[in-house]
Amino acid sequence: MDDVVLEVRHLSHRFKLTRKLAVQALDDLSFQVRRGEIFGLVGESGSGKSTVARCVMNLYQPTGGEIWFNGVNITDRSQRRKHKKMLETKRQLIFQDSGSSMNQRMKVVDVITEPMRIHHIQTPRKTPREEAAFQLKYVGLDGSYLDQYPAELSGGQRQRVNIARA
């Protein structure tokens, strides 16, 4: 069984600024992510990290190349329509701006356990709160953060909460 869940092949993206002026944000980028692998895209400001993420999440249509998710070419619009439900439920990305991706009215415990509740995921721990505490410990935060709101956390703490949620 092939364990590649995300494959980006020769991805390019160009932003058209005016009729005559365009900026090439991505040029011939290729990579694979395997099941269970934690993958990070690192680069300088303006290097295209967010553009890659937005292409993978179908927020931008690439100007070249292909993006394959679980064997489906998501750059092919007919394939996206055919597999819409699977594509909407199986991807999670953590952006650098981790604070804006969290519901600011939810406590950390709820931020972490919301995907488990939505997708009916069972864990070895007895309660969702115990699972959230376990996930926080895994990323180097203790259970005292469970009842805090995202606005009360530093940027690094919010990022770790997002990792715990994923």
Regions found by a protein language model. Give the residues of each.
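The feature captures the beta-strand-to-loop junction immediately N-terminal to the Walker
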Residues: V42-E44
